[in-house]
Design a protein with these regions (language model features):
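Catalytic, metal-anchored helix/loop core of enzyme active sites in primary metabolism
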Residues: 1-390
Length: 390
């Protein structure tokens, strides 16, 4: 598992604990939470432990608590490709999991994918490698898991559209003027999910949903014109598939990441959860009603930008990811407004010359360029930005 100390990683280990006779943990890797990683290593006794942080204090702690731990991307790759590994849970955040995941695919490992950047930035490379190696890419995100379950046994040619649901986040009802003045605390107050700060802000801007649209394009080989986002504040219906005969299949459950994680790890079977600590059945009577709303692109321009970057293809999605990686921390630090995030992304995309069929190095270089360009934009007076874009 890559990202074992993060939210998805910890919940994956909950699934492992619920079914101890079905799993053996071969490798655990994380970024810099050494104390928790060491605790996990004591509990699950993996053959490999790895971490990626370059912080000197973290490295000193690792030398004390995990003296045999591997370090860096090489350590993650060794974990992902270990001969005893059958399934890799790719749950790191950001770009660092891309190379190890590709290496695992080429080594013939089944991939349970929870890392968005892998497909958003390099979907053409990842899916081509998976086809060549005969490897399954199993989605862990709740929305893509719902689509995957609804598409099983169906013919893609009979699909009219994929409908990805969005809770709408903490700013679903906010006016554009209110969004300009929103505080960090307000943007982090997600009504449904408890996640890290970066992904919570991406949920508030609907950038997260835009990245999911690009992911769905690659996972299910579906044109962007056949992928739509609909707001569903209860987060009970996780996504839907509409077919050419007007029928719709959907997957519903109470919001919990344990279920899509388990579905990926148990595939093609379904395991009975009734006797486990994960049991979380849905009562329709308690739900009462379900609501759906259209997305207001004027208030959530990040979703529009994701569609545009996805349709443009090439290195454009990598630029979107790179610019967002810089813009969100600036907002969290109180240096820009929430609405400035979309403006920074749009301007960075406008300044980029897209490479149509990029290599992995092209993708990573484009993301790095976008990170630098977004920071330059932040330090650039508005008048200068306007002159540059003319």
């Amino acid at each position: 598992m890559l990202g074992s100390t993060g939210s998805v990683g910890r919940q994956t280990l909950d699934v492992v604990r619920a079914y101890p006779d079905r799993f053996r943990v071969v490798a655990l890797a994380a970024r810099g939470n050494i104390a928790l990683l060491a605790e996990q290593a004591r509990e699950f006794a993996p053959e490999i432990v790895a971490y990626t942080s370059d912080d000197p204090a973290t490295q000193a702690q690792a030398a004390d608590l995990l003296p045999h731990a591997l370090h860096g991307v090489a350590g993650l790759t060794a974990a992902a490709t270990h001969p005893a590994v059958q399934t890799l849970v790719a749950a790191t955040s950001g770009l660092i999991g891309l190379r190890p995941t590709l290496a695992a695919i080429r080594a013939g490992k089944t991939i349970a994918l929870a890392n968005k950047e892998t497909l958003v930035m390099a979907g053409h490379l990842v899916m081509a490698a998976a086809r060549e190696a005969g490897v399954d890419i199993l989605p862990v995100d709740s929305e893509h898991s719902a689509l995957w379950q609804s598409l099983r046994g169906e013919h893609t040619a009979e699909v009219r559209r994929l409908l990805i649901t969005a809770s709408g986040g903490p700013l679903r009802k906010a006016t554009l003027e209110e969004m300009r003045a929103v505080t960090v605390e307000q943007a982090l107050a997600h009504p449904t999910w408890r996640m890290g700060q970066k992904i919570t802000i991406d949920s508030a801007t609907l950038m997260n949903k835009g990245l999911e649209v690009i992911e769905a394009h690659w996972l299910f080989d579906m044109p962007y014109d056949q992928i739509e986002v609909v707001v569903h504040p209860q987060s009970i219906i996780h996504s839907m598939v509409e077919f050419v005969d007007d029928s719709i299949k959907m997957q519903a459950s109470l919001p919990s990441m344990h279920l899509p994680i388990q579905d990926a790890l148990s595939y093609p079977a379904r395991w009975n959860r009734a006797a486990t600590a994960l049991a979380h059945p849905l009562s329709w009577a308690d739900v009462g009603h379900l609501d759906f709303e259209a997305v207001d692109m004027a208030r959530f321009p990040c979703l529009r930008l994701a569609y545009e970057a996805g349709r443009r293809g090439g290195t454009a999605p990598a630029v979107l990811v790179g610019a967002d990686e810089q813009a969100v921390p600036l907002f969290l630090a109180g240096k820009i407004r929430l609405t400035d995030i979309a403006e920074m992304l749009e301007e960075t995309l406008a300044r980029h010359t897209v490479i149509e069929d990029p290599t992995l190095e092209d993708v990573l270089a484009a993301c790095s360029w976008a990170q630098d360009e977004a920071l330059r934009l932040y330090g650039e007076p508005a008048a200068a930005r306007e002159r540059t874009s003319e």
